[in-house]
Amino acid sequence: MKPRTTLRPSRVGAPALEQGRDAFRKQAWGEAFSRFSAADRKSSLTPEDLVSFAQAAFLTGREAEGADILSRAHQAFLSRGDTQLAARCAFWLGFTLLINGEFAKSGGWLSRAGRLLEGEPDCVEKGYLLLPEGYRLYQTGDPVAAHAKFVQAAASGERFGDKDLVTLALQGQGRSLIRQGEIARGVALLDEAMVAVTAGEVSPLNAGGVYCSVLEACGEIFDLQRAQEWTSALEKWCASQPDLVPYRGHCLVRRAELLQLHGAWPEALEWAERACELLSQPAPKAAVGAAYYQVGEIQRLLGRFAESEAAYQRASEWTKTPAPGPAQLRLAQGQVDAANAAIRRIAEEVRDAGPRARVLDAYVEIVLAVNDVAAARVAAEELCGIATRWDVAFLRALACRARGAVLLAEGNANAAIAELRQSWGIWCELDAPYEASRVRILIAQACRELKDEENARLELAAARQTFQRLGATKDLTRLSAIWPGQFQSPGPLTEREVQVLRLVASGMTNRAIAGKLKISEKTVARHLSNIFTKLDLGSRTAAAAYAFDHNLV
């Protein structure tokens, strides 16, 4: 959102207004909002200053105030006879409401913008109005028509030299092409949009929106390298604007997803919970749901089933998009029939290839648990088809694991090992220790079918070591069930908790432990809480005594 006319001198001569304008130019959003507020209390602001005031409000998380101020700018432009700029304000009010899921209010403002422009010559504001049309088509399952709208919008932006419109339209085109399965073309357009953003050619509100959209797309197509690169870029961009409130939550969710994949679960949980806190302020409903869903995923992997269920429930309050996590939770709890019913229903609902790939991965595991090998075979082949079309490493790893699991269930252990070895290798390349260890369990089972007890034992031992380090308690329990008596009990503490306990026993403070292990003090405190609970201890002194008694120091 940006005015396309040069700021007119205000009738207000107070220093606060000039200070507000200066702070706005410097992207000091908190100061800009404060100074504009002071100037606004003394006298009326120009419409252009009201637009800047509104942007400062939005960028500091004051969404309701920002909308009120922008509606004032809309009225001020109308009073001055600037129909196109009044329409632009109405557009931004409507589009923001649309993104946030407030469809009735959104429709009212967008209709007003369209009506104002009916008698106007071709202008960039008419190009902007193509964006919500494209967005609606995309959301309602017509990416081809959506792409056409975004192409028209980009052409309008080019005609009028409006970088914001061009960039927003490019990311819309990219997302629409990806939804059509044209991954390479779509990603190229997203990269082009990001070039404009990282070069500083796009206004902050729109830059943040493009960052979040591109990161969401990376997640949809499982492009981990791009997700890592653009997440780091978004973190730096947010850090350069300390007062910035929107977009930080989205950034934390993506960072949590990457940390989870790479096995840093306590840190991932901390980032995901921080995202929930940040996104509890006005934010798109899907973003809040994604944050809580991520918390649920990590808690499930850690074996904290009550906490996982609570987080999944919170996620469902914000988004109705079905996801496999709750069904996987039921499987982990031993409620196999409930898991089977849930995943079959979800598979009927989710049709888009990206989200469906995750559903199919869970589907294969769950239906094999109820011995429906035929259904698992169909799902595995569908997943392999998606992986072949998209040619993404993450999907290839999922597909090989699914096919290997089905072959193992069908009694073809040799063929299963070949598929599973491919999956394991890809997970290792992606630095995904948990996923790699899940495959190792399947390889061990295949080796056992072939009477290769030695290699089966080695695979299980390696998987057990990783699960213990990660704190994957449910998987450790599953290991013991698969091969009873093979291993001694790993004890109640994870490897990381043992590290923390040793350092506590040596007399280190939480801050010192955090520095040594390169984790946050909050994570150290969480580990200590788990240690006290698992060992039934009440103090650091008792924990230190336990460490000495059990030869941990």
What are the residue ranges of the model-derived segments?
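Linker/hinge segments immediately adjacent to helix-turn-helix/homeobox DNA-binding domains
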Residues: A393, A405, A409, A413, ...
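Alpha-helical segment of the N-proximal tetratricopeptide repeat
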Residues: V12-A38, K42, L59
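Tandem amphipathic alpha-helical repeat scaffolds
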Residues: Q19-R25, V51-E63, A87-F103, E125-D142, ...
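Helix-turn-helix DNA-binding segment
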Residues: A418, A461, P484-G538, A542-V553
